[in-house]
Amino acid sequence: MCGIKQEMSGESSGSPCSSASAERQHQTVWTAPPKRPAGRTKFRETRHPVFRGVRRRGNAGRWVCEVRVPGRRGCRLWLGTFDTAEGAARAHDAAMLAINAGGGGGGGACCLNFADSAWLLAVPRSYRTLADVRHAVAEAVEDFFRRRLADDALSATSSSSTTPSTPRTDDEEESAATDGDESSSPASDLAFELDVLSDMGWDLYYASLAQGMLMEPPSAALGDDGDAILADVPLWSY
């Protein structure tokens, strides 16, 4: 483990740096000169094409972060393995901000992967060992992603609660009312017709029955040829 050139006081501050001053002071990977290609030609390139201090580890798609300690030749600080390249890049920024604030980097400007890391990452302004820096970096990155998840959840909840329901237009309401009338009218009309036909049927039945009782029976029976038979037909003939 590399030693610390200048031992700082035990006082530490977890508040992020000022956004205005940090943005003017620190460079980012987007404004700094591009990274030089790796000198190794027989091995697969694992470094991230943009982010500093970040390289891929294995085929699982995970990323690791390791930074050079400014002012200490050949001294590197291992910061761990992360699920995303952004997590490793934020760890690099937190480490550089902590080392620079503690005087390990000479107090000058440092190159960051993200400009907003200067005020979004809560890093200590002093430390005693590089182990303290590693521990502070892990806490700063974890706190950053926790706050991001909370903000995203709050935004999703507020957007869903403020979304107004689509009002129904006059045409839709009129169409719904018309459909309701059409669906209810056949049943009522059918019941009305059945009642009317029932009353009319009974009236016709009683009228025809009374008319039949008033009619006289025929006076004589008719034969097969249509002539009337005047003689009575006996019931028995011997």
Swiss-Prot record:
Principal location class: nucleus
Bias type Acidic residues, positions: 170-182
Region annotation (Disordered) ranges: 1-41, 155-188
Gene3D superfamilies assigned to the protein according to its UniProt record, in alphabetical order: AP2/ERF domain
Biased composition annotated in UniProt, kind: Low complexity: 9-22, 155-167
Keyword Nucleotide-binding: no
Domain of life from the UniProt record: Eukaryota
Compartment(s) of residence: Nucleus
Gene Ontology, cellular component aspect: nucleus
Molecular function terms, GO-annotated: DNA binding; DNA-binding transcription factor activity
Keywords: Activator, DNA-binding, Nucleus, Stress response, Transcription, Transcription regulation
The keyword Nucleus is assigned to this record: yes
Signal peptide: none
DNA-binding region, residues: 50-115
Pfam families, alphabetized: AP2 (PF00847)
SUPFAM superfamilies, per the entry: DNA-binding domain
Protein family: Belongs to the AP2/ERF transcription factor family. ERF subfamily.
Function: Transcriptional activator that binds specifically to the DNA sequence 5'-[AG]CCGAC-3'. Binding to the C-repeat/DRE element mediates high salinity- and dehydration-inducible transcription. Confers resistance to high salt, cold and drought stress.
Protein name: Dehydration-responsive element-binding protein 1A
Species of the source: Oryza sativa subsp. indica (Rice)
